[in-house]
């Protein structure tokens, strides 16, 4: 049934999402625990960036080349349906979905994930934070509290993502809107658990509660950006319907309308990022900006699962 198919596909995506964040956080923590040197873990970030460049860019180009090539040969030249087994390029198209949307996406977000925690640790290690008697910072297990806080936020995000996957369920005969909301429930549930864990960590460490607010701002900003992207790309909403309507007058107007829509869709994410940076800097300085990025990426495990589940379900439908 539909619920069973959703569970299988999403569970497969969750394996990839949790693996990416788990390996990333574990690598940074082990390296910093062994060497106690921010420069060493910076090298870990450089390695992740180099792999992400090739996997994301190279994989993305291959994905689109295979997709367009398969459509040109099949639908345009031969007049056969998409994903038809008579078209050999269908295999390249299915493989391309995995290369670009799973492997490439995973490498890209792996780099962003480890880069955010490395930057936060480097800020503390470089001593750019002004600490006085009213803001004492002690060590726990050999880690500075301000270094341990982002690690705990991300660790709680991994567990929250695992628990959030159990919230993703639907009923038979569900509409596309129902399926999208089932995914949102998992993401929102994971975000709520991260906030609870962050509040407990800040309270336990006896730190300023402003650190909790910057994590909250990061989470909210991430959700707004994701919702904005969905609004401009989902066929349920007006923007894509307007682009489709332009097809009545020919392909040229579709290209123009689509390009214009893509440009205007960047406005909300840009404004949200600027506002979030201003608020977090006002609350906790440079460290607050870095910690808000940690909050934004804390639920990456389940967010990445929703990205990876798409190609899995798509290829299953093609088979």
Where in the sequence are the language-model features?
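Hydrophobic packing and interface segments
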Residues: 1-319
């Amino acid at each position: 049934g539909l619920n069973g198919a959703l569970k299988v596909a999403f569970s497969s995506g969750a394996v990839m999402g949790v693996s990416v964040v788990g390996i990333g956080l574990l690598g940074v923590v082990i390296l910093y625990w062994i060497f106690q040197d921010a420069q060493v873990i910076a090298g870990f970030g450089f390695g992740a960036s180099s792999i992400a460049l090739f996997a994301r860019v190279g994989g993305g180009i291959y994905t689109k080349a295979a997709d367009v090539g398969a459509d040109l040969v099949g639908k345009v030249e031969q007049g056969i349906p998409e994903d038809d087994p008579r078209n050999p390029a269908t295999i390249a198209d299915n493989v391309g979905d995995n290369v670009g949307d799973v492997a490439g996406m995973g490498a890209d977000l792996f780099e962003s994930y480890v880069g955010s925690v490395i930057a936060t640790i480097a800020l503390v290690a470089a001593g750019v934070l002004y600490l006085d008697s009213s803001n004492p910072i002690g060590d726990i297990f050999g880690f500075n509290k301000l270094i341990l806080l982002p690690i705990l936020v991300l660790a709680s995000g991994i567990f929250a993502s695992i628990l959030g996957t159990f919230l993703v369920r639907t009923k038979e005969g569900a509409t596309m809107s129902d399926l999208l909301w089932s995914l949102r429930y998992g993401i929102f549930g994971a975000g709520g658990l991260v906030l609870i864990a962050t509040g407990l960590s800040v309270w336990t460490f006896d730190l300023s509660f402003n650190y909790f607010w910057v994590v909250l701002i990061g989470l909210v900003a991430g959700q707004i950006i994701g919702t904005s992207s969905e609004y401009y790309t989902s066929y349920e909403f007006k923007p894509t319907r307007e682009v489709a309507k332009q097809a009545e007058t020919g392909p040229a107007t579709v290209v123009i309308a689509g390009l214009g829509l893509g440009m205007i869709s960047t406005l909300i994410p840009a404004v949200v990022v600027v506002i979030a940076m201003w608020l977090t800097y006002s609350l906790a300085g440079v460290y607050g900006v870095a910690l808000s990025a940690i909050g934004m990426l804390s639920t990456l495990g389940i967010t990445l699962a929703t990205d990876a589940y798409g190609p899995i379900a798509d290829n299953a439908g093609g088979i």
